[in-house]
Amino acid sequence: MNKSPIQAVIFDWAGTIVDFGSFAPTSIFVEAFKQGFDFEIDLEEAREPMGLGKWDHIQAVGRIPAVDKRWNEKFGRSMISEDIDAIYAAFMPLQKAKVADHAEPILNAIEVVNGLKDKGIKIGSCSGYPREVMDVLIPVAADYGYQPDYVVATDDLPQGGRPAPFMALKNVIELGVSDVKACVKVDDSAPGIFEGHNAGMWTVGLLLSGNEAGLTFEEYQAADEATLEKAREKARAKLLKSSPHYLIDTIADFPEVVADIERRLAAGERP
């Protein structure tokens, strides 16, 4: 097989390769707010800033106007750093306890990844999960057959996480990639797509398997085309703000994108 001009693909985790609908983090955010402060947020509010590191995510939820209004009504002030610390402290053990339940690969993910490896493409990965959570998730995903060549967690680097390029570029360094334009970043969230842009990579957004559509795999399988199109449009509206080079439904559609990027690289195009 001809060697691909693509050197590496860097995948997000939840909603991209594992955990269809990205339910592990969302449901836990709702529970952490409840446990930390007996404060209610809904799943839509929990999903809003997905893709950020989890401390930053909690802060961003607190800044949603409707959440801030309810927080002020309950506590007489907006959320402060100590509040975020307390919610994060509740989040961590809950997430570690639950993340393995959501480690099953998304349909066709393993086949697609193995196809990339067969072409000599390295598999990087990064996540909005902290290292403590990734240390639980990585071996369970490996049991399912998913073993990327490198993993970066959101708190691994002192420079920080998304939407900055640091996690993606750490993959570049550790995988020995010689040219960022030969890399593809795949994600289901806008911060993860911005991360790819900021690192100088091709970017691919996922419409139906991730956070923005918010479908369970069962809902996805049972949905008629009108329901899927409505979910696509909802996700597209959010992801287009980050201007991905490609938007596809799920990882199953990725091989066509790979072929197109290979063609464009061969023609001398850049991201």
From Swiss-Prot:
Enzyme Commission number: 3.11.1.1
Species this protein is from: Vibrio vulnificus (strain YJ016)
Cofactor(s) listed in the protein's UniProt record: Mg(2+)
Stated name of the protein: Phosphonoacetaldehyde hydrolase
UniProtKB keywords: Hydrolase, Magnesium, Metal-binding, Schiff base
Record field: catalytic activity: phosphonoacetaldehyde + H2O = acetaldehyde + phosphate + H(+)
Positions of Mg(2+) binding: 12, 14, 188
Cofactor binding summary note: Binds 1 Mg(2+) ion per subunit.
Lineage: Bacteria, Pseudomonadati, Pseudomonadota, Gammaproteobacteria, Vibrionales
A GO biological-process term: DNA repair
One MF annotation (Gene Ontology) recorded for this entry: phosphoglycolate phosphatase activity
Subunit-level organization: Homodimer.
Superkingdom, natural source: Bacteria
Gene name of this polypeptide: phnX
Biological function: Involved in phosphonate degradation.
